[in-house]
Amino acid sequence: VLKNILVALDGTELAERVIQVLGDLVLSAETKIVFCHVFPTPESELELSADRPHPESPTLSYFHVEKQLQAYQEKLSIQSAIELVTGEPADEIIRLANIYKADLIIIGSRGLTGMKRIVQGSVSSQVVEEANCSVLVVKSK
């Protein structure tokens, strides 16, 4: 039984797909969902990867993201929480998963390939490698 699920959302259209997949899971009444969003630090934004918000959308304000996560929360019939943090996205997702003793992390991946992936890196790949629990990676299509 999945008791704690961390859902990492980045504020893009991929977040909707992640929420769809969450809705497809059969969850028990005891399951707790933690929606999280990591605001990248200025240093990590310089090396923006595919799994992070696009630089042309700096309007992803704290308030906007919080409202979006609250809207997802309202769709759930089970216990949930919201975590908005700042830092290196993969590191913060793993840190939150450890704090909440997550049994599963759900994260989106835009599927960068080739040189872009090598240069920019991938938050989802790093989370898969370093997490202490299972990770469900949701593809954009």
Language-model segments: residues:
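Small/aliphatic-rich secondary-structure junction motif
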Residues: 2-52
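Gly/Ser-rich helix-loop-strand patches that form or flank binding pockets
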Residues: 4, 96-141
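Active-site phosphate/pyrophosphate- and oxyanion-stabilizing loops and adjacent acidic/basic residues
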Residues: 20-23, 70, 125
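General small-molecule cofactor/ligand-binding pocket signal
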Residues: 34-36, 81-85, 136
